[in-house]
Amino acid sequence: MLMLMLAAVATVVRAQTVCRFRTVRTGKVFANPVTLEGDLLFYAFSNTVVVKNVCKTDIAVYLGQRVFITKNRFEASILPLTIPKSMEVKMPSITSAHFVSDAMILFVIDGKVYSYNFIEDIWRTVNGITEPVSHISGDPCCFEGYFCLELSNNLFAYFRGGQMPGTNIYFSNNGGFSFELLNSDRMSHLKGLLGGIFHFHSLSQVGILLVENNLGTFHYLEYPLNHSTGVPFLYESPLEVIIKPQQRGFLILWNQKTLLVSSNSGQIVEAMQLMEEGNINDLNVEHAKLTIHSIASNTYELAFLVEQDQLYYGSQSYMGNYIIKLSNQQFWSEEASVHFWDVGMLEVLTPVSDPYFPAFDFKKCLVNVQLALMDQSLQLEPCNVEFLESTMEDRMFIIDMNSKLKLSALMVPRKGMNPTPLVMVSNPHALGFKANLTQFGNMYDGNSKFKLDIELQQQQHWGNSELNFTASIKHEAISSITVDIADKTLSCVDLKPLSTLISVGCDLTKKVIVQNKISACAMGILDPVLLQKNYSYTIEKEAYNPTSYSGEAQDDLIVFYQYKELGCPRLVYYDKPWKPVVELWKDGTLEEIMNAEYVILELNGIVTYSYSLTAATAHCRSQPQNWSIFKEDAEKPSLWNRETYVSCHEDNQDNPLLWPNVEYQILGGRTDNKIIFGQRNGIYTFYLTVVDPYYSYCDLNTIFSVYVYGALPVAEFRPMTSILLMVTVTLFTMWLAYAIPKQLRTERGRRLTGFCFQIFKYCPGICTCAWLRGKMRRGLRSRRVKDQPEKIPQIGKKPDIKK
């Protein structure tokens, strides 16, 4: 009997005690004369909270009656945080904190935003905010790459409780180094008290929480949700809004008397489901006479400590939000706080002051949630899944336009159980999928193995959703994908859902290359060795227009050939219409020969080429764009791109087809437009950019060179004119060769010859050269003598009558 009583007591003790306290105390062997300088910071509210750096979980800040920043999970004694007197803070109370990097945190102190580099111990006032604010919101992304960094840099600063419209909202796209005033035109129709503004990256939306008549409602600014709102919910007093990490769309809205959650970025806000004694009911914190003192969360878990010395633990998923009372162990104090260091590892943290040292120690109690939930008194069913794994964890995937992505997961259910796997996306407006579950073998114990195959692509390409449901295909989007078990029990703590982030946007491994199968070097026209030695060539002033100013060129242009970027030029015959063959490469592999619409521009201003099609022959229905529209920004050819391109093959009342004979300067796509080079040999350097908005989200562009050959020098006269002139001159010359000798034998010819002789004799000024004049005289004399008859008497002498 005694043994049974001892066993019962032991069971009760185990149910109540879920962890053991330990105290962290370091660096206090010898007396430390350190004194605190500046103003001691404190949290403006009566509760406590631990804000973690979600990308580097060893870093966190504790907010309470004192403020502490740790870089090692509070595993050392820490001095309370102070702000220098030079910052001139009237009331050093913190209302919001947000980590922006591994070394910097933003604080809202007394209505102003300050940045603190806790590695260098440098404080700075953030520029751009001119009116008091109370909160900073952001959603950090922890994957590597520029895309994720851009998400993390987007922040809002706002005053909670301000009247809309009329309250200034500030935004930052540089990680909080500076802020700008947000344009309020898009929010002019919103009315109520501002409860917060947030970047919901998992839904590709900006959400605004407005409160009116004790009802809170989320409004969205981006299509297709900009004309709809979330479901209203009861909002009687200000609520703190926590965006849970990893862009899953999970929210927590809470204060000391309220706890609400959302699994879809605020579209539906609901209460947690309390599991107690086998029953499940909505948790009403106020009716349960509880006062939440501190709350903790990670991606799929949450926990909170109440002033009534009770610790609650719950899970948050797309299928349900359940919570259970974990322990009645005495945790609570005014300084106590809770936070997660890992999945299923919950820590109760309490700063402890030291009368002899300024640094605070920390009393810690680490709760193994999985072990605590195994207590039979909680009456929880065991986890119905033994194994759930996939390679998609801890990776971010990219789906470009017209691309697909295939993922898979492996599931092993608990023996005798038949769980249902569930695939969910956070942004169904942009991302769609289909999934297939197949059995593919057994474990050693005879348990079945299942494989889940998932195929994802843009929602627009599935063709099974309404037009007003899908997001704009021209704009990039983000969504998470999660694989979970639909009927998973609360005890599956260690079996977290499989989830990752999908970027419906530009795949940075893509690039375009102009095919170069026949080059000028391969044909022996150019020498690649010479091209690499600062090779230069001349562009005649008649062949180019300056790119730096408008007007005609005044001098020839000398261009140095960039062999490293251009390689050997492609060889093109001048008299043959030509179109570049553009290849699309992805991650070093040739994907396809591109057939999208693109444009080219000669970078040195050469204008001796044209296009084979006009607006009419290209079957345009509106006036086509051309480079003259962007001529004011000739130094920025990238301004004509997929975002600024407007197709002429669609009706456009604002730009009707008025000039059908203008050049159609777009290559590729539905037309067979080609380049026609003028009668000029030489090198052309082109910039090529893809303008088709439905081909890729990337700004695909490249530069390439061609060498045009085979052009003869340009004739100064028209060919027909030259031929007529040549024939006329030939015939006239032949007539003169016949007519002149004949005329010289006549009396008129002799008189003409004598007349010419007299002119050359008495007009020496006609030829100033004596030698040449003598030659001409002798020539004329010999010609005259030769042409005369043999018996003509000599001039100036009488004839010999005797003979």
Curated annotation (Swiss-Prot):
Q: Which cysteines are joined by disulfide bonds?
A: C19-C365, C55-C142, C141-C148, C383-C492, C506-C698, C521-C568, C620-C648
A single GO CC term for this protein reads: sperm principal piece
Predominant cellular place of this UniProt entry's protein: membrane
- Keywords linked to the UniProt accession: Cell membrane, Cell projection, Cilium, Developmental protein, Differentiation, Disulfide bond, Flagellum, Glycoprotein, Membrane, Signal, Spermatogenesis, Transmembrane, Transmembrane helix
Q: Report the subcellular localization.
A: Cell projection, Cilium, Flagellum membrane
User: What GO terms describe the biological role, i.e. biological process, of this protein?
Assistant: flagellated sperm motility; sperm capacitation; spermatogenesis
- Provide the glycosylation site positions: N226, N418, N436, N468, N534, N545, N626
Region of interest: Disordered = 782-803
Source domain of life: Eukaryota
Residue ranges of the TM segments: 721-742
| Stretches of the chain found on the membrane's Extracellular side | 16-720
Q: Cytoplasmic face: residue ranges? A: 743-803
Keyword Cell membrane carried by entry: yes
The answer to whether UniProt assigns keyword Signal to this entry is yes
**What are the boundaries of the signal sequence?**
1-15
Q: How does it assemble?
A: Component of the CatSper complex or CatSpermasome composed of the core pore-forming members CATSPER1, CATSPER2, CATSPER3 and CATSPER4 as well as auxiliary members CATSPERB, CATSPERG, CATSPERD, CATSPERE, CATSPERZ, C2CD6/CATSPERT, SLCO6C1, TMEM249, TMEM262 and EFCAB9. HSPA1 may be an additional auxiliary complex member. The core complex members CATSPER1, CATSPER2, CATSPER3 and CATSPER4 form a heterotetrameric channel.
Q: Please describe what this protein does.
A: Auxiliary component of the CatSper complex, a complex involved in sperm cell hyperactivation. Sperm cell hyperactivation is needed for sperm motility which is essential late in the preparation of sperm for fertilization. Required for CATSPER1 stability before intraflagellar transport and/or incorporation of the CatSper complex channel into the flagellar membrane.
Q: What is this protein called?
A: Cation channel sperm-associated auxiliary subunit delta
Q: What is the lineage of its organism?
A: Eukaryota, Metazoa, Chordata, Craniata, Vertebrata
Its gene name is Catsperd
